[in-house]
Amino acid sequence: MQTQPRHLSKPHRQTAKFTACALGVAALVAAGAAHSAEVEVLHYWTSGGEAKSAQVLKQMLEEKGDTWKDFAVAGGGGGNAMTALKTRVIAGNPPAAAQIKGPAIQEWGDEGVLLSIDDVAKSEGWDKLIPPQISSIMKYKGQYVAAPVNVHRVNWLWINADALKKVNAQAPATWDEFFKTADALQKAGITPVAIGGQSWQQAETFETVALGVGGAAFYKKAFVQLDQATLKGPTMVKALETFKKIKAYTDKGQTGRDWNMATGMVISGKAAMQFMGDWAKGEFSVANKVPGKDYLCVPGPGSQNAYTFNVDSFAFFKVKSPDVEKGQKDLASLLLSPKFQEIFNLNKGSIPVRQGMDLSKFDACAHRSAADFTSSQAKGTLVPSWAHDMVVTPAVEGAFYDVLGNYWNDDNETAQEAADKLAVAAKTQ
């Protein structure tokens, strides 16, 4: 899951702005690179469920005769990883593959450093296997330069089942139900909502709130089209008011808390609910918790008919070694293989990005995710997660983070003031 260098713990962030001089030096250094057959993979899957998934990928690649070199960079948001990647590319020593997402793939493509894996994609029919809303993100100038590994749903609400039973409540489907349940939980001495005080977690929570309050059409106009009137309009103000209201139901120890620590609060029963993408399910699985029994996975209030997607992907970098290039293409092929798609996504909490997969081994949360993905695709309510690098530029996303983080932490700022700031942030270059 991941953020930019100044937002240090988000499920992803990347910038790719280099000078021509630096790239020239990089090319010269790369020309003398060692002829190692090892495939170095930069990723930020370092928490329980995610780390297990990385191990699966390593094992499968090595079964193909390639050597995996692990380049794991802690910091769930990927900001630290992208800083490390930028340094390596400038030095002319990029990893063979790196976990990169959304518009950032295009930015790296513009720098001329990405390797086309179109031959693998064509021979394996990726255009028929990957939904078009996702395959378009993986291509640069019509050629695949990245491979997707999964589909995460972001607009989930995770609930401790016992906590709900203690207050005789059902999973909330509306915001009125949500706050009524939160009041009951608070009176029972249970923290209603677990969150980490990091800007990406605040932004992700707001993203789900905005989708639930305004619907998919509003969401697209505001966060895909960046329409100024919508960003500072009454629906946005209502979404911001709802978002701020949630804060009263969180604990005072949230500063700096990582997302998986917040998930742990729900798992243990210290807290009742968490807004988080379905990478959180990996944490429940590692703790041997069962969906429907120990915990519930439901769409955020009001967002039942929409689906916010977040796709993990690996982009491939140009290298001078034919051996490494073979390993890169082996890795690309592996990422879309049915075997890896099944094992990986069972560990990760996500669903396969490869269409037509047998989901019989997947749990109830995954089945709901897959069904809702398909129905949202048909209804036009499938939307990219702006909070997770899938649609806006890193600059705009970072500016949104700042606005929402400041609003969350400033009790005196009004929702209209925050909405006006979002409209300005959308113009960030």
Regions found by a protein language model. Name each.
Residues 34-113, 123-126, 171, 255, ...:
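Conserved N-terminal structural module of periplasmic/extracytoplasmic solute-binding proteins
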Residues 37, 59, 63, 91, ...:
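Extracytoplasmic/periplasmic substrate-recognition and gating elements
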Residues 87-88, 94-96, 126-162, 191-192, ...:
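A structural signal for short loop-to-beta-strand junctions that line the ligand-binding cleft
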Residues 102-154, 179, 205-207, 292:
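Hinge/lid segment of periplasmic solute-binding proteins
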Residues 118-130, 136, 170, 197, ...:
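Short, solvent-exposed loop/beta-turn-alpha elements that line the ligand-binding surface or hinge
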Residues 140-149, 179-228, 271:
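Extracytoplasmic/periplasmic solute-binding protein
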Residues 148, 314, 357, 371-426:
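C-terminal capping/gating helix-and-loop segments adjacent to ligand/active sites or protein-protein/ligand interfaces
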Residues 182-185, 225-255:
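Glycine-centered hinge/linker elements that transmit conformational signals in sensory
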